[in-house]
Amino acid sequence: SDAIEVTIPSFEGEMGILKDHIPLITFLRPGIISIKNQDEKNFFAEEGTVEFSNNNLLILSSTVKDLKNFDKNSISGALKDAEKKLQETNLSDKEQYITSYKINSLKEISQ
């Protein structure tokens, strides 16, 4: 069935997309994608691209995990990897920014 609303984490902030939303292309930052229809499904996504046009939503991301299948050990491992990456001295500002968002999102999920 069609989604009533999809909320995505974009670099502009949390963005809610409803039917007949204006066309858009934006960049996805690490965070929670929420899809609402009769129930609600939540996914953790890493960076990517979002396009909405003619009531079709396309999300391209290297990693998307269903939160109901994302166990504490997986979250903990991903969090440790991200924190370790943030300690690297050769990261670009963009990589630091994205990794920080990833860490914050993973901490939010783990609670």
What are these regions (language model features)?
Residues 1-81:
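Compact, glycine-rich, soluble single-domain proteins
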Residues 65-111:
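Acidic/glycine-rich phosphate/pyrophosphate-binding loops and surrounding catalytic core
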